[in-house]
Each structure stands twice: as structure tokens, then as C-alpha cells.
Amino acid sequence: MFPTPIERTPRSWQITYQTLLPLALILWLLPLIAVAIFSVKPDADFANANYWGWPSSFEGFTNYGLVFTGSDMPQYLLNSFKITIPTVIGAVALSCMTGFALGIYKFRANIWIFFMFVAGNFVPFQILMVPVRDLTLHLGLYNTITGLVLFHIAFQTGFCTLFMRNFIRALPFELIEAARVEGVAEWRIFWFVVLPLMKPAIAALSVLIFTFIWNDYFWAIVLTQGVESQPVTAGITSFNAQYRAAYHLMSAGSIVAALPPVAMFFMMQKHFIAGLTLGAVK
């Protein structure tokens, strides 16, 4: 049922694995390296088909300076933070409560309610595109940061509930029973007993949701348009002119847009790993 650890496989498989892994890593990193290199090249290098060669001149400071001073990139970055941070807070807060209810209390409709939360994650985005857009238009939330935040919270709560519910079910139930014997109210059990134990899971889930929402492009172009509300993933396309694209500026903007999720992961790396591995071994 489970894959065999590489240490237990024949020596020939281990050599194959050790040979193919660096190649796969290089293939995965190659596009990222290309974008990073092109972000410091002059615009003429693209016209001269100098895609992988050494830059004809180093224009890193100029390109990154133009990204911040010659475009609306600062506003797009601000919009991304305005969208991502409230979404993370809202989705994680709701999932903590729904996960507690579905993980602790036993009632007849428990599994069906849990199934409703999880089933939404299997609906293709393309099916929801037109109904969600029409809904935001009728509610007056189209092309607003608030509308995008509310949609992301609603859509991400299903996955977050799955994550939190499974984490809470792995906690020692004796702690909750002991608190009930002492006459502690249910909301105090959640706030003072369960929630402190959920900190690693909250940290791991926050990093995941932050990355998901920050990198979202599909709903950014479906529900928003213009500088006032579009996040950075959609705003990068503003470097496309009518007849040509400024690929050197687009590459620099892509590097800038990728930095916040990377910084978020490294700042929360300890808690992220603890949240994913807690309960994996006894």
C-alpha cells in the first residue's frame, strides 16, 4: 500500500534515483533560473535571441527600478496583501471552529456536513467561473477587493476544515473530557484547551493558504480588472504593450511577486514542518 523507502530498494534502483533526482531538479529550476537571468538583461537581448546567454549588459538595477517607479507594481503588491492577509485570517479562523465542531462532537449529520465541506474542493473552477462572476455582479462586489476576499474565504474554508478536523481528531480526547468533568464551558474548552494545541497546524495552514491565494491568477482575472483591485499575479500582464511585451520588466516583476511567499515560508519554516509532521509518529 505504501511505497518502499529508497534505502530498502535494490542498489540499481538507488543509483537510478540518485542520478535522475538532480536532473529532475535542474529541469524544475530551469524556468526559474531563466526568469531570474532575464530580469537583469536589457530589452535588446530578447530581440537578439539572447535567451540563455550572458547578458550583453547588466541592467538589474534599471529593470527593478522601473518595475517600482515606472509601473503600478507597488499598487498591485499592496492589493495582493489586502487580499491575501484577510483571506488567511478568515479561512483559518472559520476552519478552526468548524474543525473543532466536526472533530469533537458526534452527531448523526457529522459526516454529511464534513462531506459538504470537502466536496466543494472537487468542483472545477471552470464550472464556477460564470455563476460566481454573475453573483458578484448582482451583489455589487465585482471588481472589488472585498468580493475577491469573500470568495477566497468561502472556497478555501473547505480545504482548511479538512486539515483542521483531521488534526483535532488526532489530539488526546482525554483532555477535553477532563475539562468537561471540571465544568468548563465548551467555548472555553475550545479557546483555552484545543486552540493552543492547534498552533502548529494553524502555522502550517497559514503558510499554505498564503501561498495559494498569493499565487492565484484565475480568479484574479475573472473577478477583478484594473489597478484598483487586481493582485500582482494579474498586474504583471500590464507589462504587455499592444504590439510587444517588455519581457525584461515582466521577468523582474515576476521575481518581485515571488518573494513574499518565499519569505513567508522561511519565516514560518519551523512551525510549518512541525504542523505537517505532528502526529506522524507516536
Report the location of each language-model feature.
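A structural signal for multi-pass alpha-helical bundles of membrane permease subunits
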Residues: 2-9, 13-282
